[in-house]
Amino acid sequence: GGNGGNGAAGGNGAIGGTGGAGGVPANQGGNSALGTQPVGGDGGDGGNGGTGGTGGRGGDGGSGGAGGASGWLMGNGGNGGNGGTGGSGGVGGNGGIGGDGAGGGNATSTSSIPFDAHGGNGGAGGDAGHGGTGGDGGDGGHAGTGGRGGLLAGQHANSGNGGGGGTGGAGGTHGTPGSGNAGGTGTGNADSTNGGPGSDGLGGDAFNGSRGTDGNPG
């Protein structure tokens, strides 16, 4: 996905574009070897949010594209775009929110043991702008959820990690840091084992300020 445009003076940055979905190849079926099975394409990464104009808020990051499904290996979900940086001047603008990670592709094969794709990671929160009173850091994006297991005892994939919180702005009074979001959740089919949860997002740091709150694990 494309990056969002920068905001005019005092304006907010544009939201980044969503990443394209991964391709879905034809399922060849059968019990052929792993190397002959089709592989789904990875989802595109979301675009970064634009930088806010003077005093303006940074744009939010775009979401990652979904991973493509296939008969054997699935494409991974795209990563969320990073939040845009807040504009400087007067009171610094707040950082944009990180884009959400996309879910991994799901297994579709019934002829062999499938492997799941991983969910995309959440984009990092944008940094706050400097000057006057620092703006608050943006929160990290939400992690993508791992793809579901296939019909024949597939191992479920791990979920994506939560995006880290943005950094608080400097100057005058320091802004508060952003908070990390929770990791994604793995959900398998009845005959599949669940994958591990995504890691919790880390809170952002402020210059000479307190640290942000960590997200909860999935």
Specify the residue positions occupied by each region the protein language model found:
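Glycine-centric low-complexity repeats
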Residues: 1-218
